[in-house]
UniProtKB/Swiss-Prot annotation:
One of its GO terms (cellular component) is nucleus. Keywords: Chromatin regulator, Nucleus, Repeat, WD repeat. Belongs to the WD repeat ASA1 family. Component of the ASTRA complex involved in chromatin remodeling. This is ASTRA-associated protein 1. It is found in: Nucleus. WD repeats lie at residues 9-46, 49-86, 167-205, 317-357. InterPro entries: WD40/YVTN_repeat-like_dom_sf, WD40_repeat_dom_sf. One of its GO terms (biological process) is chromatin organization.
């Protein structure tokens, strides 16, 4: 299995990807965003979005939402990438958030043109807030400092000696919307909680601790199912309204830090930098390893993979034959893997192949 191509422009470790305006955007730990032309494999635009690592990126109806370690959430307007050629563009919206941990923020479209934004709480990192964002960018806090019900803690849980009483499930690690009225939250303790939002308020539906004591690192949704990866080798599958996991899988590597779901394939990235593909019946199909391209000095940045993203090429408008030939390189699904030395490697995903990746 061979890689398709590499993208080289980041001077810091790659921290994430997302699609925006039919282009691929990558972010790094310096706060830089790069918009890529996948036909030429070169940056189409580049700008500094944050003073520190970009933790979250998501396209929205308002523009590109980014969230950084500089304790800010910003929204960049459509066309910001083009405008960046004359200098860094200006966000059309900005709000402060709690970024004491590395938790993401989660956005989802709501009713009447509004949107919901879940963030770590302003007061406590083990709680969350939910804001309602209006089309005019006015904010209203819908949920404040929400934590799991303390009575849900089991008698069999062991507290550390000297730990403050009632500290709950530890800091929030991951947030994921399933619907505008359903939010999943992963905790440092290994707990996964489901919350229901309504005009009457927010209430916890269930809380499961099958990952404990290993922190939740990743959340992914497929229909009614929620997949959660932890600092251990375990990936759990929950199917509401059941509190207990309906499936538990040992993926063979510690730290399931990212997880992607395809119709025929599961993809997982781990702390050791490896990326593995699994069939829908959880047989490992392949493991991606980055080849050594040159002799490296001991002080060189780590080559470990840090994040992955599946890109689906947008429907192309009418093109000339020459343009069609150039864009064929970027056609279909591509798996992008971001590395700690700033390199991005792309692999072609073959929808008809049993092993999931295109063989050369």
């Amino acid at each position: 299995m061979e890689k398709m191509f590499s993208l080289r422009a980041h001077a810091a470790p790659v921290s994430g990807f997302c699609p925006w305006e039919n282009q691929l955007v990558s972010a790094d730990r310096s706060g830089t965003l790069i918009v890529w032309n996948l036909s030429t494999r070169r940056p189409a635009a580049r700008f500094r979005a944050h003073e520190g690592q970009v933790l979250s990126m998501q396209p929205t109806r308002f523009g590109l939402l980014t969230h950084g370690r500089d304790s800010a959430v910003r929204i960049w307007p459509p066309g910001a990438a083009e405008n960046s050629k004359g200098g860094d563009p200006h966000p059309i919206f900005e709000m402060p958030v709690n970024a004491l941990n590395f938790c993401n923020v989660a956005y989802i479209d709501g009713a009447d043109g509004t949107a919901l934004l879940a963030t770590p709480a302003s007061v406590d990192s083990d709680c969350f807030d939910v804001y309602r964002l209006s089309p005019d960018f006015s904010l209203a806090r819908a949920v404040e400092n929400q934590a799991p019900k303390q009575e849900q803690r089991g008698a069999d849980q062991i507290e550390e000696i000297g730990a403050p009483p009632g500290r709950g499930e530890g800091i929030i690690m991951r947030l994921a919307w399933a619907a505008p009225d359903l939010l999943y939250v992963g905790y440092e303790s290994g707990a996964l909680a489901s919350f229901s939002l309504s005009p009457e308020g927010c209430r916890m539906l269930w809380l499961a601790r099958a990952h404990s004591p290993h922190p939740v690192l990743s959340l992914a949704l497929e229909g009614a199912r929620v997949y959660s990866g932890s600092a251990a080798k375990t990936l759990l599958v929950h199917e509401p309204p059941h509190e207990e996991a309906v499936a538990k899988h040992n993926l063979g590597h510690y730290g399931v830090q990212c997880f992607e779901i395809l119709p025929h394939l599961y993809l997982a990235g781990f702390w050791d930098g490896s990326v593995a593909g699994f069939s829908r019946d959880w047989q490992q199909l392949f493991s991606l390893e980055r080849p050594h391209e040159q002799i490296e000095a001991p002080e060189s940045p780590s080559r470990k993979s840090l994040c992955l993203f599946v890109w689906s090429a947008p429907a192309a408008p009418e093109q000339s034959r020459r343009d069609r030939l150039r864009s064929r390189r970027a056609a279909g699904r591509l798996l992008f893997v971001g590395h700690a030395d700033g390199l991005i490697v792309a692999y072609a995903i073959d929808e008809s192949s049993e092993n999931g990746l295109l063989e050369s």
